Amino acid sequence: MMRNMAGMMKKVQEMQSRMEALQQEMADTEFTASVGGGAVTVIVTGKGEMRGVKIDPAAIDADDVSILEDMICLATNNARGEADSAMAARMKDITGGLPLPPGMS
């Protein structure tokens, strides 16, 4: 019984180490999304931090900035969605598909 427990603890420690490495890797990885035919491009990290926004000057309409605002929001959400999907796929590889307790992602 103690051998099983020791083996299980070792596996948990290995999984935790791999998860920490993944979190660092994701923090350094950039995800890009463009909308409006490239009018707006947003770059975020795997942790969701925005690294950059590129706006085609032709997309700027001083009389109606709401379209530009919507495109920025959409591009940001798309880039974050890509980052979240990548993180979920990598976490599934690490955990073997086991659900994680809340707060361990």
Where are these regions (language model features)?
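A short acidic/small-residue loop/turn micro-motif
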Residues: P57-I60
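Stable alpha-helical structural segments in soluble proteins, enriched in small hydrophobic residues
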Residues: M71, A75-A86
